[in-house]
């Protein structure tokens, strides 16, 4: 007889401040944005990592935070509506705005982030690839916290596992079968492993090649997500799609190709010292108050 790990009981509310209740997923978003902001500021302050002054100032980064926060939330929600449950939201459109009931998509949030980077850079005359590098370098922080929140909320659990698997567990809403804690797999792959790889790349000079961190994040995240999807239970309203693939796999496969193409272009282009992608105004912008 196998002994299964008992799923721990968590209070759905992480922090209570009088009538205000902050749930774990909201706390993950807040923590991811705040920690990512601090890490991004540290990257921009290190001229050694860029081979000179960073093409984006800390003040400009501070302005960008509001843009990307809105983009992640709106994009994540729109992505979930379009990719995962369009029929339901066509019948109940008012539910689209009820974010507290759950339903966010990484792929939608990422596309929102891409749009925010492009629009912000065009407005302020900044290099798109360099801001994309910074934004994706901090991405694994939010991914890690988000997956931990998924685990605490007992959602997005894994497929049924062999009862002999030492860490298999029975989730409250997952039926009587022991399941893979796929949220923790994703936290390890998309969060810890991806952050470590990108941090090592940055230490070795990746920021000197605009787009290298961005492309690596896109490709490596997609690969990690595809692997995790083999252990994750598909969304019940979708199930398995073509050839046994899941929606997460279908959305991630193109990301591998796009990411590798960006990596190839970044490596072929050369370092920032010889790169003409920086806008004419970027040199002046690095001389403003860098906080």
UniProtKB/Swiss-Prot annotation:
**TM helices/strands, residue ranges:** 24-44, 64-84, 100-120, 125-145, 187-207, 211-231, 247-267
Task: Enumerate the UniProt keywords alphabetically.
Answer: Cell inner membrane, Cell membrane, Membrane, Transferase, Transmembrane, Transmembrane helix
Membrane association type: Multi-pass membrane protein
Annotated signal peptide: none
- Residues at which a 1,2-diacyl-sn-glycero-3-phospho-(1'-sn-glycerol) binds: 147
Q: Which GO terms describe its cellular component?
A: plasma membrane
Extract the GO molecular function terms from the UniProt entry: phosphatidylglycerol-prolipoprotein diacylglyceryl transferase activity
Q: Which domain of life is it from?
A: Bacteria
The enzyme's E.C. designation? 2.5.1.145
Please provide the Gene Ontology terms (biological process) for this protein: lipoprotein biosynthetic process
Where is it predominantly found? membrane
* Database matches in InterPro entries: Lgt
| Annotated PROSITE patterns | LGT
Q: Where in the cell is it found?
A: Cell inner membrane
Its job: Catalyzes the transfer of the diacylglyceryl group from phosphatidylglycerol to the sulfhydryl group of the N-terminal cysteine of a prolipoprotein, the first step in the formation of mature lipoproteins.
- Family per similarity comment: Belongs to the Lgt family.
Protein's name in the database: Phosphatidylglycerol--prolipoprotein diacylglyceryl transferase
Task: Supply the source organism for this entry.
Answer: Nitrobacter winogradskyi (strain ATCC 25391 / DSM 10237 / CIP 104748 / NCIMB 11846 / Nb-255)
């Amino acid at each position: 007889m196998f002994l299964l790990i008992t799923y721990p009981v968590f209070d759905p509310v992480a922090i209570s401040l009088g009538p205000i209740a902050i749930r774990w997923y909201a706390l993950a978003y807040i923590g991811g944005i705040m920690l990512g902001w601090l890490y991004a500021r540290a990257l921009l302050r290190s001229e050694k990592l860029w081979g000179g002054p960073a093409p984006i100032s800390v003040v400009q980064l501070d302005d960008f935070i509001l843009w990307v926060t809105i983009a992640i939330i709106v994009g994540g929600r729109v992505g979930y509506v379009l990719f995962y449950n369009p029929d339901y939201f066509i019948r109940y459109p008012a539910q689209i705005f009820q974010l507290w009931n759950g339903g966010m998509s990484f792929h939608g949030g990422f596309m929102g982030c891409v749009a925010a980077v492009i629009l912000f850079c065009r407005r302020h005359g900044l290099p798109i690839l360099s801001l994309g590098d910074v934004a994706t370098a901090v991405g694994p922080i939010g991914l890690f916290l988000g997956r931990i929140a998924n685990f605490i909320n007992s959602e997005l659990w894994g497929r049924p596992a062999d009862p002999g698997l030492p860490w298999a567990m029975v989730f409250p809403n997952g039926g009587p079968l022991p399941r893979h804690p796929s949220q923790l797999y994703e936290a390890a792959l998309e969060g810890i492993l991806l952050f470590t790889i990108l941090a090592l790349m940055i230490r070795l000079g990746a920021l000197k090649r605009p787009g290298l961190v961005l492309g690596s994040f896109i490709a490596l995240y997609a690969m990690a997500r595809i692997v995790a999807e083999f252990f994750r239970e598909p969304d019940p309203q979708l199930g398995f799609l073509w050839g046994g693939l899941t929606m997460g796999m279908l959305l991630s496969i193109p990301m591998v190709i796009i990411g590798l193409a960006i990596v190839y272009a970044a490596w072929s282009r050369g370092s920032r010292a010889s790169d003409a992608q920086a806008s004419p105004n970027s040199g002046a912008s690095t001389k403003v108050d860098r906080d």
